[in-house]
């Protein structure tokens, strides 16, 4: 059983956490501001540079949402202080990525280039065959990285495509020729 929800979250210097009506939490920091509405049954307290999340009872739903809420608040605090970055790697001959303003243009072996405009709050940078997706909202950064990866998932036979940096692709054996 996880006990993540019981751990208090430390608030670093320069970060301000406010809990509004109906558990609407706003976190302000040097990189920006994030807000999210959490389950109103949970009790979120901000006391002396710490955030504590308490649940009203021990039902399985409350136990699950307790740990999730604590993790989401911790990610909001980390996002406004450090930010999040996901790196993608392009593997394959003729596969390239270029920046066109804020948008990214991908050439992935299709008959046409793919233009992708990132949502508000997410930045994309291209360095050679590496695409860096960064921002303060962990969910948005991960979603954009997954969307870019979906344009050309790694091929199971040769490994060509877009993959997360460090992702290991298990390659399948090709057809064996009979005698």
From Swiss-Prot:
Gene Ontology terms for molecular function: rRNA binding; structural constituent of ribosome
Keywords, in A-Z order: Ribonucleoprotein, Ribosomal protein, RNA-binding, rRNA-binding
UniProt GO cellular component terms: cytosolic large ribosomal subunit
PROSITE patterns, A to Z: RIBOSOMAL_L6_1
Coiled coil: none
UniProt-listed GO biological process terms: cytoplasmic translation
Top-level lineage group: Bacteria
Record-linked InterPro entries: Ribosomal_uL6-like, Ribosomal_uL6-like_a/b-dom_sf, Ribosomal_uL6_a/b-dom, Ribosomal_uL6_bac-type, Ribosomal_uL6_CS
Function comment: This protein binds to the 23S rRNA, and is important in its secondary structure. It is located near the subunit interface in the base of the L7/L12 stalk, and near the tRNA binding site of the peptidyltransferase center.
PANTHER family on file: 60S/50S RIBOSOMAL PROTEIN L6/L9, LARGE RIBOSOMAL SUBUNIT PROTEIN UL6M
Subunit note: Part of the 50S ribosomal subunit.
NCBIfam families attached to this UniProt entry: L6_bact
HAMAP family, sorted: Ribosomal_uL6_B
Family stated for the protein in its record: Belongs to the universal ribosomal protein uL6 family.
This protein's name: Large ribosomal subunit protein uL6
């Amino acid at each position: 059983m996880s006990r993540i929800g019981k751990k208090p979250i430390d608030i670093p210097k320069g970060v301000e956490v406010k809990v509004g009506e109906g558990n609407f939490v706003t976190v302000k920091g040097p990189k920006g501001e994030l807000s999210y509405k959490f389950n109103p049954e949970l009790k979120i307290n901000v006391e002396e540079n710490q955030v504590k999340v308490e649940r009203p009872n021990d039902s399985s739903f409350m136990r699950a949402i307790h740990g999730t809420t604590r993790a989401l608040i911790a990610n909001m605090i980390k996002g406004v202080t450090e930010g999040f970055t996901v790196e993608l790697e392009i593997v394959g001959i003729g596969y390239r990525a270029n920046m066109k303003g804020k948008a990214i243009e991908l050439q992935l072996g299709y008959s046409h280039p793919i233009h992708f405009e990132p949502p508000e709050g997410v930045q994309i940078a291209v360095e050679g065959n590496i695409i860096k997706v960064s921002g303060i909202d962990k969910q948005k950064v991960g979603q954009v990285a997954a969307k870019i990866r979906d344009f050309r998932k790694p091929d199971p036979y040769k490994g060509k495509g877009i993959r997360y940096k460090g992702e290991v692709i298990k390659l399948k054996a090709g057809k064996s020729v009979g005698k």
